[in-house]
Amino acid sequence: MEDFVRQCFNPMIVELAEKAMKEYGEDPKIETNKFAAICTHLEICFMYSDFHFIDERGESIIVESGDPNALLKHRFEIIEGRDRTMAWTVVNSICNTTGVEKPKLLPDLYDYKENRFIEIGVTRREVHIYYLEKANKIKSEKTHIHIFSFTGEEMATKADYTLDEESRARIKTRLFTIRQEMASRGLWDSFVSPREAKRQLKKDLKSQEPCAGLPTKVSHRTSPALKTLEPMWMDSNRTAALRASFLKCQKK
């Protein structure tokens, strides 16, 4: 699984996931399923944000190519992927600026158009079950929840899906691609089932051979959002990073 993750995801996402796990004392080489899950969640958060801007009239627009107008502002502030200290600094700054209620737990994004924090969920189970778990954990009606599954299902607070249908379709396609690529390498069952994961881990520890069939090249294309993980007060420099690129596993 570790080899698959390093081949399938952009190196910057992998690096952020490794830092996040090490911050909590977890080892990506051992807890490989969690490693894959964190990388997936990070990428979906970035895809959620990519190409969405607010114009001078306060309207939400999508810009997919070329350099956006200097008057445009990123619609979403990315909180996920930052270290905890910086993440809370960003959250506090948003709350002080907008007057929104400070969340008890770190959210993933902030939507400047709807003026709300967003919690993104990616699940291998039923979306409604995961949604309820998220809602029970957050315990706040102020934070908007949006859940995606690897089977193309989604669920959001009050059925408000925030993004346009095409943007959400890209996310669903990416998740389906990840699932198919895992399945083709015999990794999906262990990713879904904890019992199977333990069996797979024992098998991996016995074998030091590289995973057969993995692509030998890594895509170094970078999502626009990956280039914008600086403090929000540097927002004026963010627009230059816009490049149309969505990450996909390379074909075998």
Curated annotation (Swiss-Prot):
It is found in: Host cytoplasm; Host nucleus. One of its GO terms (molecular function) is RNA binding. InterPro entries: PA/PA-X, PA/PA-X_sf. The record marks R195, K198, R199 as: Important for efficient shutoff activity and nuclear localization. Keywords: Decay of host mRNAs by virus, Eukaryotic host gene expression shutoff by virus, Host cytoplasm, Host gene expression shutoff by virus, Host mRNA suppression by virus, Host nucleus, Host-virus interaction. The record marks K202, K203, K206 as: Important for efficient shutoff activity. GO terms for biological process: viral RNA genome replication; viral translational frameshifting. It comes from the Viruses. The active site is at E80, D108. Belongs to the influenza viruses PA-X family. The probable endonuclease active site in the N-terminus and the basic amino acid cluster in the C-terminus are important for the shutoff activity. The C-terminus acts as a nuclear localization signal. The C-terminus is recruited to host protein complexes involved in nuclear Pol II RNA processing. Plays a major role in the shutoff of the host protein expression by cleaving mRNAs probably via an endonuclease activity. This host shutoff allows the virus to escape from the host antiviral response. Hijacks host RNA splicing machinery to selectively target host RNAs containing introns for destruction. This may explain the preferential degradation of RNAs that have undergone co- or post-transcriptional processing. This is Protein PA-X.
